Amino acid sequence: MKLSSDAILPKAMTEGAAGLDLFCLNRTAVTSSRFSSKATIIHTGLAMELPKGYYAELVLRSSTGRDTKLRLANQVGIIDADYRGEIMLYVENLGDHLEIIDKGQRIAQMLIHKIEEVEIVEATSSLSDTERGLESGSTGKGTGRKTTRKQQNI
């Protein structure tokens, strides 16, 4: 739903695009985070009603990340199916200079996902051992170490 007549509906820019591009509603200046402790709000002028069982994920366009020092303040935005407010992006400028986002500029993408229902069940015994074990951030590094919970006395 357009909240402003100037809003541009999200659009898949190519036939195989996974995300829908989001457009900036107004020309917006994003101050360097060196000079501001608050994120800048980028308005889209849009609101939506997702079907029950779905959510939207907001991510920066890769070209925005490549060409600027702008980042989403929360790294990724999540829009729940029961949210009815404006779709907004909270942006930080990690660079040294002011960044201008022009009206109508594509800055982020919205991906729509189906929620998979899961049931969380507390383990009452132990978890199975795997080749990776408990090594965090170790895949492909060939540490050769395998730690189990028994070895850690957890």
Can you annotate each of these PLM segments?
Residues 1-154:
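DUTPase catalytic domain/fold
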